[in-house]
Curated annotation (Swiss-Prot):
GO terms for biological process: rejection of self pollen. It comes from the Eukaryota. This is S-protein homolog 12. It comes from Arabidopsis thaliana. Keywords: Secreted, Self-incompatibility, Signal.
Amino acid sequence: MGTNKIPKTLNGNLVLILIITIMMVTHSHGFQLEIRNELSGRYRKLVYKCWSRDNDFGWRQNWPGQYKDWSFAISLFHTYFYCHFRTAYGRVDKQLVASWELKQECGDRRKCTWVVKKDGLYLRQWKTKFFSNKYGNERWNVYIEHDVLKKSWS
């Protein structure tokens, strides 16, 4: 009498629900997906449409030097974006997967950049290069971009 007990049906499930809730809160950080037009030459316009299960971003148009980015939270599993890219050089249909693994591949914890160039669709990776002076008492780092071709125009 007077003791508060958790009902037996919730005892194990309550702990499981609590753990899943904590994991979802700690694993849903903000993230950006960026599409950048770096086409050169006469035919430089990029037209694309991207959508996910929850959102349709519609058709967009970028000229060289322009970019578009979307911010969202990565779920505990994966967030899938599908995009149709159209240029005078060809077209690419690509599934852009926003996941924890892709964040590692991009080299940036907050943003993944997809770059459209004359020969295809690239994923921009950021590498950190460390420097120090000859005495070793001053250190600094520089972020270097490196584009990896993921899909050629068809």
